[in-house]
């Protein structure tokens, strides 16, 4: 309403389009999202600002992503029965980093007292699954006994809250995973990686042009493309079949039939996407138990979504049960 009031003359003249209203009903119908969690709500709902208020911190204080990453990491370490001395590597895998360097992973490593090495990586919404692959490779190669993967996703920071088609998509959260050899695993709950497969396909349909070279051309400052932008319908049309084909092909190569799967923990971007992908993989509609949804509560939490789904829907698994953990997103990327 504020925008339409300010642009009333241009709207009346037909030179500017009026901004349409959004609603809870529209959001739920379009995405399946009913709620979400964000780092700062007040700044977002302030119609004069519509962006989170996250004050800069001094270099002597933990960064925001480090703080949330440490909290998630400590819980993962507790559940896995691991101390800092047991871990040799930290990978921060997320869709955005709040600074280029020093790496958030190295800051988290220092905060936890972990020796070895750490690095940041970004494959957008597939960052967590790509991180798991990197961790698995490190353990198998012998360069690390145990790897901590942390996914601090502050998605509200790159979201355009003026865009009716995407303002509702993302939420903020942090997850953490520990990958190690079965020989050193001590947790009461242990999950074996049977196989993993990564794929990237270049596309401009999901994009964010914010970067350090923006200062070289002031004409783009504040433009919409410096935040999250996507061609949603194109993404749906192109990503869903690619994801289903990758999962189906991987299962076939392993000699696993779809009816052997106990669960599909899919990236939590859109309810309709997950319903279509799971139907193509299973050959029928998946039950809520087979393909659990958590985006109704958390919204799209980028790389953390499938990890949250796994975390909240794993208690009933028995030894020998099989499942697929899959993420997909900008790039395109599928893991």
Model-predicted segments: where are they?
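Acyl-CoA/ACP chain-elongation machinery
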Residues: 151-152, 159, 201-208, 271
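Conserved beta-ketoacyl condensing-enzyme motif
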Residues: 36-123, 253-274
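Flexible, glycine-rich active-site loops centered on histidine and acidic residues
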Residues: 143-174
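Short beta-strand segments
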Residues: 93, 122, 147-153, 179, ...
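Claisen-condensing/thiolase-fold acyl-transfer catalytic domains that form or cleave C-C bonds
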Residues: 66, 70, 96-97, 110-117, ...
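Short acidic, glycine/serine/threonine-rich loops at helix termini
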Residues: 101-104, 132-133, 158-164, 205-206, ...
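Solvent-exposed alpha-helices and their adjacent loops that cap or buttress functional pockets
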Residues: 83, 112, 139-142, 167-171, ...
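Condensing-enzyme catalytic core mediating Claisen C-C bond formation in acyl metabolism
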Residues: 1-63, 163-241, 245
């Amino acid at each position: 309403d504020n925008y339409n009031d300010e642009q009333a003359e241009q709207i009346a003249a037909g030179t500017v389009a009026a901004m349409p209203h959004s609603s809870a009903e529209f959001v739920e119908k379009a995405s399946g999202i009913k709620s979400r969690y964000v780092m700062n709500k007040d700044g977002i709902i302030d119609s004069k600002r519509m962006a989170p208020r996250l004050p800069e911190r001094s270099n002597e204080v933990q960064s925001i992503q480090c703080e949330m990453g440490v909290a998630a990491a400590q819980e993962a370490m507790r559940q896995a029965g691991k101390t800092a001395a047991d871990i040799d590597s930290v990978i921060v895998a997320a869709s955005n980093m709040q600074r280029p360097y020093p790496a958030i992973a190295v800051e988290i490593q220092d905060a936890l007292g972990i020796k070895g090495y750490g690095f940041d990586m970004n494959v957008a919404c597939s960052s967590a699954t790509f991180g798991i692959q990197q961790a698995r490779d490190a353990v198998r190669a012998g360069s690390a006994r145990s790897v901590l993967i942390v996914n601090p996703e502050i998605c509200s920071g790159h979201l355009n809250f003026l865009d009716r088609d995407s303002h509702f998509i993302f939420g903020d959260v942090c997850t953490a995973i520990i990958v190690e050899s079965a020989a050193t695993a001590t947790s009461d709950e242990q999950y074996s990686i049977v196989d993993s497969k990564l794929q990237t396909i270049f596309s401009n349909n999901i994009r964010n042009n914010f970067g350090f070279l923006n200062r070289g051309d002031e004409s783009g400052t504040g433009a919409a493309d410096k935040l999250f932008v996507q061609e949603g319908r194109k993404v749906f049309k192109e990503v869903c079949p690619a994801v289903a084909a990758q999962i189906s092909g991987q299962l076939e190569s392993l000699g696993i039939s779809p009816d052997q799967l106990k669960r599909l923990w899919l990236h939590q971007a859109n309810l309709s996407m997950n319903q279509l992908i799971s139907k193509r993989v299973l050959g029928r509609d998946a039950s809520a138990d087979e393909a659990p949804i958590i985006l109704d509560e958390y919204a799209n939490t980028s790389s953390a979504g499938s990890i949250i789904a796994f975390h909240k829907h794993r208690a009933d698994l028995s030894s020998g049960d099989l499942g697929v953990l899959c993420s997909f997103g900008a790039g395109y990327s599928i893991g």
